[in-house]
């Protein structure tokens, strides 16, 4: 009887298992690398020299008072800082000097270095600039470079120093500037589409990820060019009021990982304690990370109350620092409670290592639930 070679099924199974394990390990390594990139976001802060970029950065992240920013000098080339936010998110913040020579360098020799792997572009316009056409021409070149190298980046435009415009005409001036910037943005996108016609068409939906589309997707060189003039966000800002906190809270909101989980848990907490409203602040900057409002609280007529609270708490923190002699970046308080008879009750307390929470209770509710 002839002998036949039997296939070595044990060896084949072992080889398949080893290959599967290798593939799994590679996938996990890639996922970890992706998550690491998500948690370290490259943020470009750009605009003409003197537009107020470094001032707003110092107020938000370095606890400067508005009046203290007068002693800040002009930014030379790129001022790179790593801002830790909520513990696990690092903002790789590139504060780019706005002098003409630097701008030309960013758009030529350093083009790929500056505009690659960008998560967010924050562009600042000085509303009182005397050379608007030149400012817009530079902006068009910046947007073209961004779309070329990081076409999935989010764009935020801040129309700054709005306090210098008369209150009666402020809204009209802002609306006209917004329309102009959107039109110029469309022109910049059209330039790149003309150069790369193969990348025209609507953008596909980004892959799901923690914290929304921004946190779950990274720029792809082959993705279609988006309609930035539609998706971009524009804000009127000033260092002298709460408008700066509104703009920067919106920027941070798009960068926070697991934001949907935070919002869900905050809503559950609000319902459980029968609150009117809850705000979650980042500990150092006091930017609003997330918020929840009850159906009754939605009737509050003050739409800017969230950024107002950021501004008030930051000012109170500065006051505590002044009278206690502690550094501005130090933790100035753990909690406080405020009551107005039976009509209003609110408390602010340290919530986690990196956050504070503000809770407003409905009229008549006892506010003794604030931690002691």
Indicate where each model-derived feature is located.
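Short, flexible boundary segments at extreme N-termini or domain junctions of P-loop NTPases and their
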Residues: 1-48, 79, 189, 202-223, ...
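Glycine-rich phosphate-binding P-loop
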Residues: 42-64
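Switch I (effector-binding) loop of TRAFAC-class P-loop GTPase G-domains
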Residues: 61-90
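Switch II of P-loop NTPase G domains
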Residues: 77-81, 88-145
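Canonical P-loop GTPase G-domain recognition
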Residues: 164-267, 276-277
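A charged amphipathic helix-loop-strand protein-protein interaction module that recurs
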Residues: 262-263, 293-348
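Short hydrophobic alpha-helical segments used for membrane anchoring or interfacial signaling
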Residues: 278-284
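Short hydrophobic/glycine-rich mini-motifs in sensory/regulatory modules
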Residues: 351-358
């Amino acid at each position: 009887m002839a002998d036949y070679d039997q296939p070595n099924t044990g060896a084949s199974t072992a080889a398949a298992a080893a290959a599967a394990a290798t593939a799994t390990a590679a996938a996990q390594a890639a996922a970890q690398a992706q998550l690491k990139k998500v948690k370290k976001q490259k943020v470009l802060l750009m605009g003409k020299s003197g537009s107020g970029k470094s001032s707003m950065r110092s107020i938000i992240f370095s606890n400067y008072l508005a009046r203290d920013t007068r002693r800040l000098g002009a930014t030379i080339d790129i001022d790179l800082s790593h801002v830790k936010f909520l513990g696990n998110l690092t903002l790789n913040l590139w504060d780019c000097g706005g002098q003409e020579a630097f701008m030309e360098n960013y758009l030529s020799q350093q083009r790929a270095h500056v505009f690659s792997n960008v998560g967010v572009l924050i562009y600042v316009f000085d509303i009182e600039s005397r050379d608007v056409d030149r400012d817009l021409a530079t902006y068009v070149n910046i947007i073209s470079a961004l779309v070329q190298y990081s076409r999935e980046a989010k764009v935020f435009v801040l129309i700054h120093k709005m306090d210098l415009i008369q209150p009666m005409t402020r809204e009209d001036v802002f609306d006209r500037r917004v329309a102009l910037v959107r039109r110029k943005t469309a022109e910049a996108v059209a330039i790149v589409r003309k150069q790369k016609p193969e990348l025209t068409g609507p953008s596909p939906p980004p892959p799901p990820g923690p914290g929304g589309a921004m946190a779950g997707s990274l720029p792809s060189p082959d993705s279609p060019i988006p309609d930035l003039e539609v998706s971009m966000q524009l804000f009127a800002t000033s260092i002298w009021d709460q408008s700066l906190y509104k703009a920067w809270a919106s920027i941070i909101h798009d960068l926070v990982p697991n934001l949907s989980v935070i919002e869900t848990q905050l809503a559950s907490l609000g319902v459980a304690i029968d609150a009117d409203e809850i705000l979650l602040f980042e500990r150092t900057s006091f930017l609003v990370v997330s918020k929840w409002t009850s159906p009754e609280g939605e009737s509050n007529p003050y739409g800017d109350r969230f950024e107002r609270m950021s501004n008030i708490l930051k000012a109170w923190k500065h006051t505590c620092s002044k009278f206690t002699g502690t550094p501005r970046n130090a933790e100035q308080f753990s909690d406080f409670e405020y009551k107005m008879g039976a009509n209003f009750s609110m408390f602010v307390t340290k919530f986690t290592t990196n956050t504070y929470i503000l809770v407003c209770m409905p009229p008549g509710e006892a506010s003794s639930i604030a931690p002691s």
